[in-house]
Each structure stands twice: as C-alpha cells, then as structure tokens.
C-alpha cells in the first residue's frame, strides 16, 4: 500500500507539472494551460465503496483510475459518519488551490440518516485539510432536517466568493437546493443557508451542478420521484 500511494503521489505531481508549467502565485492559470482532466468519484452504496477515488483522462472521455482504483483519502478520518459520497473538486480562481466538498454519509444507515457535509482544501490534490459542517450542530432550528446531499462549489464573480450549494430535505417537504458562501479559509459557511432553486412544481430536485457558459449560469439538476430525469434552469435576469 505504501508503494501504491507513492506511485499515486508521483502521478498527481506529474499531472500538476503538466497543468502548471512554471507559473507563480502571481500568474493565474488559464484554460489553455490544462492538458488533463481529473475525475473524482465514489463506487457504490456500501461503506467500503463510499470513499474518494481519482481517475485521469487526456481527452475527457477515456479515464484510468489512479492508486489502483483504491480510495485516495480515508473516509473515517475526514468524516463524522465513516463514509463520504458525491465528491466534487473545483480549482480556485488563482489556479493553485483546490476545493473539494463531499456528502458525509453511510447510505447503509438509510437515505435520511445524514446531516453533514465536509469541506476540504489542498494545494497538491494529495494532502487535504478538512472541516465537517453538521447542519443541525452549526445552525439552530434544524430539528426537522432529514438529509444533506451532494454539495458542490462554484465561484461567484459578483460576490468574489466561493458558493457551496447542496440539496436538503426537511420532514414533510421536498428536496430543495440550498446555498451558502464559504469563508476565506474554506473551513466554514458564512450565514444561514438559503434556497437557491425550487422547481415551479415545488417537487424535489437534487444533485445540482452549475456551469458558467457565455455569460450565463446553467443549473443542471435531477428530479426525484416525479418524472425522473436531468433538467436545466437558467436565471430569469
């Protein structure tokens, strides 16, 4: 395992070397400098499969697993439940820092069993700091909260901050996508979570993914329990 992790670290270092050629902290990286894609994933719905894994691609279509397909982080160390799901990595605006968010959850305990997410930060994709955000412990009035799912992060250019968004469900209600801004250290959320998107039919929506293209933010999301599928929403103004 020690040799495997060493090879994994070397692979990540080589990938960073390819994507960060001779840049300093004063020179933000632009898209033309990227030569590889990093895909972060988990493999299933059991505790042994709920962990962060890496795969790399040169074309965005064909990926090969790093670290022999084994987890690159110990879920028991970074989470409160012992498992994590739904990993999402975002490269920062300066190109040198990486933010990852994951669901803190053991699905074997039930789909309504989790109340937390984890915020992680790294400069090399290997060594990560982490902070657990338990919604019921962090905020008052969360007694009816049932679950916290699939967080992601996007940079808000108007606010100049990184926005974390995720799905939450309260007893008797639908899954709704909420948001809050992260603090500068990416260790906590600022202020109370607020609804980001509620479908017109007021039904559940989960697994939000925001993509910025041609001056417009596109929110892709999955409907749950009512004509399941992937939908997209854009701002009205």
Predicted regions and their residues:
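Beta-rich carbohydrate-recognition and catalytic domains
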Residues: 25-148, 154-237
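Intrinsically disordered, low-complexity regions enriched in polar/acidic and amide residues
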Residues: 6, 24-25
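Bacterial N-terminal signal peptides
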Residues: 9-21
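N-terminal secretory signal peptides that target proteins for export/translocation
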Residues: 1-5
């Amino acid at each position: 395992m020690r040799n495997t992790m060493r090879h994994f670290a070397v692979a990540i270092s080589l990938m960073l070397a390819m994507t960060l050629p001779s840049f300093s902290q004063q020179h933000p990286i632009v898209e033309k400098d990227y030569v590889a894609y990093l895909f972060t994933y988990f493999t299933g719905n059991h505790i042994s499969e709920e962990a962060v894994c890496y795969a790399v691609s040169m074309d965005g279509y064909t990926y090969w697993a790093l670290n022999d397909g084994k987890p690159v982080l110990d879920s028991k160390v970074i989470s409160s439940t012992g498992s994590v799901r739904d990993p999402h990595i975002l490269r920062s605006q300066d190109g040198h820092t990486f933010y990852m968010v994951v669901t803190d959850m053991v699905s074997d305990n039930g789909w309504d069993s989790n109340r937390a997410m984890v915020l992680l930060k790294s400069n090399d994709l290997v060594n990560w700091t982490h902070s657990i955000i338990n919604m019921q412990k962090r905020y008052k009035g969360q007694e009816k909260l049932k679950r916290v799912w699939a967080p992601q992060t996007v940079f808000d250019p108007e606010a100049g901050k990184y926005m974390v968004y995720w799905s939450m469900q309260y007893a008797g209600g639908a899954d709704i996508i909420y948001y809050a801004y992260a603090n500068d250290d990416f260790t906590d959320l600022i202020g109370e979570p607020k609804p980001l998107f509620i479908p017109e039919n007021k039904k559940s929506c989960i697994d939000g993914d925001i993509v910025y293209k041609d001056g417009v933010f596109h929110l892709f999301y999955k409907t749950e329990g009512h004509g399941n599928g992937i939908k997209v929403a854009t701002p009205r103004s």
